[in-house]
């Protein structure tokens, strides 16, 4: 064939290595080749496997998952220093499981804090398992004292804002005169009464304006929202905290004052440590004018406090119809879409395109398998991946109604410190079972 060759002796090993495509450094006798041959030999494409680590936190990736062909995919929600993320998918697609895995794995970071606003108690087992606090906001045992710190002028200003937002919700026009009346009353009771008497009943008894008295009476022990009239606050924080909101969601008028108070208290514990705030069923937050404005403000400033907000909802419409849609879209650099076979329908396709997806990406979401596949996209890249969870992980993040009943039984019959032992017996796993 007219080929010239040389029988290698001293460089035999290097000659063989140089025949392996892409291994060009071992060839001491490099010959010119045309670009066609070069393209066939050069490793110019590969499956995107995600960032090797979380560069913002200088720590390992958040999650190691599996993608096409069992290739490793490293999931990180941070894009540079922005960790705000949105997770969207229809019911039964694995939303709660993924949120719990994000929460569980985020604990690997030094001094990490996790705060979950849950619906359906899907994160209760995980919260109890890691020794966190679980607050059921619809439980009669929950009590708040929002005026407890008004002896501090900054706290007094917040209390004024909180009370005025409640007036607006109750269709009371807030005039400068009303603000002055509330402020002077807050100042009076702050300088007159001890901390345990700084309650809603005290401020109502100190007011003279009938409109204010009748409106704020709802927040007292004799009103509909008596949880705000405690003389001692039951709210406390740990590094892993879950607030169950399902019952609260059924009382729409109390959602805003409750969440505004909790988020105000939450600001006190955000100290720059890596933190995430997970908002499950985020439509509740986006649908409320007072709270949506708070989220608009938070998304812009929490990044500087090393806090990531994760929105999760079952409906794209809830997000796109929100008056802060563009704020959420711009702030959430990472987006995770759950499998949705109806994604290719014309109405849904328009909604997905409003999130910046193209036809091919929408088709991937439509063809994905529910409860198994998730589609991540950001400016860094896109990847369909599978959490590929083992039995041990699923024992804590894959929770159903029967599991909730068993949890109630364990908490009733055993001390809290024995919860993990009893739960693992029930699930047939142990601390060393990672299969």
Feature-to-residue mapping (PLM):
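P-loop NTPase motor domains
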Residues: 4, 17, 21-73, 79, ...
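Walker A/P-loop NTP-binding active-site region of P-loop NTPases
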Residues: 93-146
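Hydrophobic anchor at the beta1->P-loop junction of P-loop NTPases
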Residues: 87
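Short hydrophobic alpha-helical runs that function as membrane-insertion/retention elements
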Residues: 6-7, 114-116, 133-136, 308-312, ...
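A short, charged
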Residues: 97-119, 280, 409-435
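Conserved ASCE P-loop ATPase motor domains encompassing nucleic-acid-directed helicases/translocases
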Residues: 1-15
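C-terminal regions of RecA-like/P-loop NTPase motor modules
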Residues: 12, 18-49, 90-91, 316-435
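Short, ordered loop/turn segments at secondary-structure junctions
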Residues: 10, 119-120, 139-140, 282, ...
């Amino acid at each position: 064939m007219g080929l010239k060759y040389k029988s290698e002796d001293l460089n035999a090993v290097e000659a063989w290595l140089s025949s392996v495509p892409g291994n060009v450094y071992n060839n001491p006798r490099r010959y010119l080749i045309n670009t066609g041959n070069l393209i066939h030999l050069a490793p110019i494409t590969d499956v995107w496997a995600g960032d090797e680590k979380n560069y913002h936190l200088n720590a390992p990736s958040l999650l190691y998952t599996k993608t096409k062909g069992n290739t490793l995919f490293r999931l990180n929600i941070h894009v540079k220093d922005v960790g705000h993320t949105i997770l969207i998918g229809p019911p039964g697609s694995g939303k709660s499981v993924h949120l719990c895995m994000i929460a569980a794995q985020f604990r690997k970071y030094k001094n990490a804090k996790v705060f979950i606003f849950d619906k359906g108690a899907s994160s209760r087992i995980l919260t109890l398992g890691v020794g966190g606090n679980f607050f059921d906001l619809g439980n009669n045992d929950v009590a708040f004292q929002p005026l407890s710190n008004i002896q501090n002028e900054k706290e007094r200003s917040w209390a004024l804002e909180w009370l005025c937002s409640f007036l607006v919700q109750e269709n009371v026009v807030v005039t400068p005169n009303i603000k002055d009346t509330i402020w002077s009353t807050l100042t009076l009771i702050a300088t007159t009464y001890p901390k345990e008497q700084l309650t809603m009943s005290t401020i109502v008894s100190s007011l003279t304006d009938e409109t204010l008295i009748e409106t704020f009476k709802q927040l007292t022990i004799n009103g509909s929202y008596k949880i705000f009239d405690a003389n001692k606050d039951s709210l406390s924080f740990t590094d892993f905290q879950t607030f169950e909101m399902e019952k609260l969601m059924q009382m729409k008028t109390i959602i805003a004052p409750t969440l505004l108070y909790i988020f105000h208290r939450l600001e006190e514990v955000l100290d720059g440590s890596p933190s995430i705030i997970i908002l499950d069923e985020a439509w509740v937050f986006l649908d409320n004018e007072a709270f949506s404005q708070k989220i608009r403000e938070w998304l812009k400033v929490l990044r500087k406090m090393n806090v990531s907000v994760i929105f999760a909802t079952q409906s794209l419409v809830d997000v796109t119809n929100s008056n802060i849609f563009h704020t959420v879209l711009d702030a959430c650099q990472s987006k995770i879409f759950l499998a949705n076979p109806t994604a290719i329908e014309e109405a849904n396709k328009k909604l997905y395109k409003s999130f910046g997806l193209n036809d091919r990406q929408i088709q991937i979401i439509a063809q994905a398998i529910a409860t198994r596949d998730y589609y991540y996209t950001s400016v860094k890249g896109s990847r369909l991946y599978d959490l590929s969870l083992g039995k041990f992980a699923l024992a804590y993040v894959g929770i159903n109604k029967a599991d909730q009943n068993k949890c109630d039984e364990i908490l009733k019959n055993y001390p809290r410190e024995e919860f993990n032992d009893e739960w693992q017996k029930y699930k047939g796993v142990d601390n060393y079972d990672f299969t």
